Amino acid sequence: QYGSSRRYAEKLSEQTGIPAVSYKDAPDLSGRSVVVYLGSLYAGGVLGLSKTLRGFSLQDGQKLILVTVGLADPCEQENLDNIRASLRKQLSEKLVDRAKVFHLRGRIDYQKLSLGHRTVMKLLYQSLRRIPMEKQTAENRELLETYGKRVDFTDFRALGPIISEIQGKTI
């Protein structure tokens, strides 16, 4: 919605030749040998994931690569656990277990958020400020530190392992 996933998808498309298509226009995926889904993390879910993969089942020889894009640092195990839990809320456990999952960091510019998103972020920020810092999760501490600012963690080099997975190279 704000561009990080789209920027990653376009760069991935340039480097692999796989077309970047919005989840709103996703074609039938059943005949594809490799399905790559890049989606933004919003409020505990991946935007468009359920809609795109509704009724999808992985066939023999098919590869599903799920890529989440958000502000959470994927080097923090707690963040990885939270992201995986959100995937399990949207997809069957079997599909998540068979998928290769990657996490990329995106960007946020609070000035460009919709009124609704700004309001939600403000309420979240105000709620988190009431919790003692030593009880905050790493993700929440980062949100408190960056609230109201323009932050960009985009790193196209992070696409390397995803490209290797698409090409069938062991990573």
Tell me the role of every PLM-derived stretch:
Residues G44-I171:
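FMN-binding flavodoxin-like domain, especially the glycine-rich phosphate-binding loop
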